[in-house]
Amino acid sequence: MTTYPVPQNPLLLRVLRLMDAFSKSDDERDFYVDRVEGFILYIDLDKDQEDLDKVYQELEENADRYCLIPKLTFYEIKKIMETFVNEKIYDIDTKEKFLEIVQSKNAREQFLEFLYDHETEQEKWQQFYVERSRIRIIEWLRNNKFQFVFEEDLDFSKHVLEQLKVHLFDAKVSKELTQARQLLVNKSKVYYSNEALNPRPKRGRPPKQSAKVEAETTVSSDIYTKVPSAARRFLFLPEITSASSLTFSEKFDTEEEFLAHLRGGGRLEDQLNLAKFSERFDSLRELSAKLGYDGDGDASDFFGEEYDDDDDDDDDVKPKKAAKRGRKKARS
């Protein structure tokens, strides 16, 4: 059995990065969490086959070092959406529409698209999704016996966090790092408490509604000293400093990409509607010509009096064009 270096304090993990990996883990994408340093591997099948062979060999030979992040099943995805709708949406018509979407094909993407048309529900979803994802991740880490602390939960300076990573396997460190390690040990115990999986609701009157301002989390640099050479090209290192950057979508990697898709989809829909309207208008003009309401006829009899102004404008324009042609002939 392989012997690995022993970390001298709980692993510093990024919960937002874990949320991203958990949401993307599916039948085509594998993510692993390292037990030694806490880094995440994303087995990208688009990499060179030689690199893939090496990393698969590393995973096989050191299977006890890496934990495969579980896949989100169809049932779990549906359950997440249903729970949100039943617990957080109060308008009956809106709730019925959401539940109808949940039962449809491609429910995950349709759910998000409909959600972004309802700003109030969107904010509630963001909070719900982050809270439920956090609980799911903590439960999984506990089941796999990780001793950890989420870096986003700490109030340490960036310098101290980076020094803790640099000296993760050093028994003797400075007094400052010794104190920081003790704080990490105490903090790590909180994640194994009952409250970590069952957060207590805040008591008292809810605060007044105000403009929502989300502060980005300050995180330290990624410092890993024990990454096997075969795994280095597969490190999963997205810079996620805000929960609003996360997305529940299975097709898009970031919230920005999903929103860009929605905006693009809106423009495409407008273009299609405009094309349909243009085709119908052309059909009406052809029909009017067949019925005798051509350019010399009185189009107002066919289209109605509301088009009189437009026809007058056309009549005003046509003589001008004729006059121009007349002048050209005169010059010749």
UniProtKB/Swiss-Prot annotation:
Residues 196-215, 291-332 are annotated as: Disordered. The lineage of its organism: Bacteria, Pseudomonadati, Chlamydiota, Chlamydiia, Chlamydiales. InterPro entries: UPF0158. This is UPF0158 protein TC_0713. It comes from Chlamydia muridarum (strain MoPn / Nigg). Belongs to the UPF0158 family. Residues 295-316 have a biased composition (Acidic residues). It holds the Pfam family UPF0158. Residues 320-332 have a biased composition (Basic residues).
